[in-house]
Amino acid sequence: MNETLRNSVKTMLRETFEGPLVPGKGSWFTNSESNSGIFGVLEGMSYDQASMSVHGTTLAAHTDHIRYHMWGTNEILKKGKQPEMDWGKSWDIHSVDAQQWNRIQEGLRNEYFTLLESIDAIEWNELLANEVLSSLAHSAYHLGAIRQMLKVVKV
């Protein structure tokens, strides 16, 4: 992957998770204010809020599902093949306590930073490029879903 495209992918991933590079000065696709990425949206959310069911799923489940998908991406980048994954199980979280909620968020942060580092280190091919781009699209989709769920949770 050429350097320009690699840098663009990293920019989009950062915006998805960390929000716009310069809050208030525009963005590529999130809201332009700070904390509009996944980490900012989740910041300050209590474990009770993360456990509230919205149409049969929770913010904790969405957050861990993003982590799980990104873990799979990181495994593919490391080993060159898809790990065995149980997608149904990735939605099994119905309630969390404070410690579990912190662990889920920390796990997501770790997978995110692992992916960012890997983007500069891997030997690119079509499979790996598609996997990284799918992780970006998947995470952006769930950012939107989480933002919609928050309208119910924070009422």
Can you say where each PLM-predicted feature lies in the sequence?
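Acidic/histidine-rich alpha-helical segments that form the ligand environment
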Residues: 91-133, 139-140
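Short, contiguous alpha-helical
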Residues: 2-35, 39-42, 47-89, 124-155
